[in-house]
Amino acid sequence: MTSWTEAELPPGAAYRGATVEALKRRRDAEGDKYFPSVFNPGTLSRRGPIRVAEDRIPANKSQDGRPGFNMYYELHGEGPIHLVFLMGLNNSCFGWLDQVDEFGHDPRYSVLVLDNRGYGNTDAPHTRYTTSAFADDVADVFQHLGWTEPRSVHLVGVSMGGMIALEMCRRYSERFASATLLSTTAGDAHNLPPIKGLGMIVLSVSEQIVGAGSPLNRIKRVLDVLFPQEWLDAKSPTDPHGRTNRELVLPVFLWRFNFARR
């Protein structure tokens, strides 16, 4: 079960109108079938987990001794225009909250978000992780949803999600009507992130492996890489209390980290 105990939600932590009480009622009602979600249940049309990669992950490499692994997804809206948003390294699909809120309420769209293998509500098989493997995982979800028509999906990927998107375009090019790539790269031995970003990734992953450090410190480092310092230090133009963007964003990231723990 989750370990989050905050009395109120930080603004922007979950769907518009969400309360701690509503989220807890949903958790209690679903019992053993519960998977943490920040998205609006009012726009939810389908969700996982589903079994994927049964032909690629042998039983001795899965968490439960069966071929493949359980992959979590949520589909919001029921419109004819299909959108999929792919998240980056070590982040859950919760990061697409604003996009799901916006497009999920629009009757023209169906919007798909998912947790990549190894993070969030998705299993972590004991095997090599590659962008081609991630791409095939997403393709399995498409197959499950029936998103197989030519030029029927608009693809969006950020950071590592952009790399997965590029791999999907290479392997399944006929599926996509468009591709939007955010803060990403096509890959190259000499095309590395800035030293600051590399240092953050190495330190954070190392701390998680050995159980050192704190979520708060890791999240602070992530914010310093994701956002410009001048923006973090600036007063938010929409906050009535005059807080900085850092003061508003940090509690959201920390709350989501705690909330996502099952």
Per-range role (PLM):
Residues F85-G88, S159, T184:
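Glycine-rich His-Gly loop
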Residues L23-T127, F142:
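Conserved HGGG/HGGXW glycine-rich cap/lid loop of the alpha/beta-hydrolase fold
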Residues F103, M168-Y172:
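Aromatic pocket-lining residues of Rossmann-like dinucleotide-binding sites
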Residues M1-F39:
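N-terminal targeting or regulatory segments adjacent to alpha/beta-hydrolase or S9 domains
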Residues R66, S110-V156, M160, I164, ...:
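Active-site loop/oxyanion-hole signature of alpha/beta-hydrolase fold enzymes
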Residues R170, A177-G213:
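Flexible "cap/lid" loop of the alpha/beta hydrolase fold
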Residues H190, P215-R262:
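Conserved alpha/beta-hydrolase catalytic His-Asp/Glu region
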